[in-house]
UniProtKB/Swiss-Prot annotation:
Function: Probable Fe(2+)/2-oxoglutarate-dependent dioxygenase involved in oxidative demethylation of nucleic acids. Binds nucleic acids with a preference for ssDNA or ssRNA to other types of DNAs. May play a role in nucleic acid damage repair.
Protein's UniProt keywords contain Nucleus: yes
Species the sequence originates in: Homo sapiens
Protein name per UniProt: Probable RNA/DNA demethylase ALKBH6
Residue span(s) of domain Fe2OG dioxygenase: 96-227
Gene behind the chain: ALKBH6
Amino acid sequence: MEEQDARVPALEPFRVEQAPPVIYYVPDFISKEEEEYLLRQVFNAPKPKWTQLSGRKLQNWGGLPHPRGMVPERLPPWLQRYVDKVSNLSLFGGLPANHVLVNQYLPGEGIMPHEDGPLYYPTVSTISLGSHTVLDFYEPRRPEDDDPTEQPRPPPRPTTSLLLEPRSLLVLRGPAYTRLLHGIAAARVDALDAASSPPNAAACPSARPGACLVRGTRVSLTIRRVPRVLRAGLLLGK
């Protein structure tokens, strides 16, 4: 997806300048009341719905993405409402989102730099609930970075970092999605640089230069589209 094709007209007022293309950041995408409602629904989910990973735990809604295709599952009404709200922004080639990954991060937890991969339409949208976080972007590793004959290289530094406040919507498209890695450092406090602010600082009331932001428990709703969908019978070879 080229940068020009990745633009979303309805979101252009929220485009993050001075950042890799194409990133949109929408503050207060949902209300405080909606945030509280969604958090109640997430934490009221049955225990078997949770999967514990190293550094976070998650819920998977809509089906399990698979290279052969995803057998779709109906989204619960409390999620479908917000999937529709995001889909109405025309992020997924005119088609609706059909998958939601719910992540819970406790203070001090994060996720290693990664790419979302080819199972998804090349756009990711994330609603943040409960607490802020800082999302870091990295250039992909080069083959020579893994050369055992070379001296060990220091950990990569982010090319840019965004502050994500509660109730915000983040959308990644184009090179920001297809080329760069993104991750969240395992930290309890985010110390903002006193000399430079995140590129989306103008939309973040808490982004004061030199501020130390203490993380709380954060829940993210990652809303995407899985293009390849199968009926159960096809997956079973029937």
